[in-house]
Every structure is written in C-alpha cells, then in structure tokens.
C-alpha cells in the first residue's frame, strides 16, 4: 500500500480509555457474516437469538492495545483486551470461566471514550481463523482491606491488519439477541 494523502493534525479533544466491552462466542457468527466497506465494518450478521454480551468492569480498568510489527516481511498486529472484574463471587467467576474457557475463541466489540466501536478478533483476510483467546487470568484477594479483589483478564489475538472500526451498527443492535 502506498502513501496517497496528507495527514493533518486536529485540535479536537481525543480521550483515552474504553467505555465498554462485549464478547460473543466464535460459533455464534457464521463465516462470511462480517463485511467491510472502505476500511470499516458495516455488516455483522449474528445467528438467530445470539448477541454480544457486555462485561461490566471497574471504571478505567478496560484497555484495548494494538501493537504492530514487521516480521520476515509480513505485517502483524497483536490485539489485546485487558479488563478488571471486581469481586470473586460465583457470578463473576462463572462469567470469567465462560469467557476464558471458550476454546474456539471469541470476538469482541470495544467502544472507546470517543464513541468509536471497534471489532476485535476478526480480520478481512483471515475471517474467523484468529479470534481472541485467553492470554491470562490473574485472580486474587489482595492483602489489605483497601486492595483490589477480583480478576484481571487479558484476551489476545493476531491479525495482519489493525482492528476495523464499526459504522452504521449501534452498540444496542449488537448487544440485543438477533432475530
């Protein structure tokens, strides 16, 4: 790909952080059910009754990272989502187990603090072949009364592209069972 345009800086505010994250099992999306137009995801067809499930985390504890590198002449991006789920109760632990033990992998949608939604765990070239999978699950009680008690989950995948933004599809549409 050649450089074909200038990049001008903008004076508008850009905030860091992630507002929310939701996951769906790989088996709930058919191959070819996602399409991209002009570098943006504009179609995601979910199986009937399926949806992305929101994982509420502590404020300012969700992070999406995208690290690119050139290896042997090939571009590779490592996508990571890290979130902290407060508490070690059964409900939280069951939700974590469902996420990290999904051996076929998951896709995620992440909404950043600027309102842009990204699809993570899918690539136009590889379709559903490189979904997100658990990299780590670190749970603990903390030592003192004011220490964090809960789980830090890291999900990761590799792709030949940066994650695609989603346009024309709302968060509410993706997190409501498909009909």
Task: Please report, for each region that a protein language model flagged, where it lies by residue.
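Solvent-exposed edge beta-strands and adjacent loop segments
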Residues: 2, 10-82, 128-145
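Generic "edge-of-domain/loop-turn" microfeature
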Residues: 28-31, 88-90, 115-117, 127, ...
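Oligomerization/assembly interface segments of phage tail-like spikes and tubes
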Residues: 68-91, 147-161
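A general structural signal for short secondary-structure junctions and capping/turn motifs
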Residues: 72-73, 98-100, 109-110, 143-147
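Short, conserved charged micro-motifs
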Residues: 90-98, 164-167
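Short, acidic/charged, Gly/Pro-enriched secondary-structure junctions
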Residues: 97-124
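Mixed-charge, glycine-accented linear interaction segment located at domain edges/termini
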Residues: 125-179
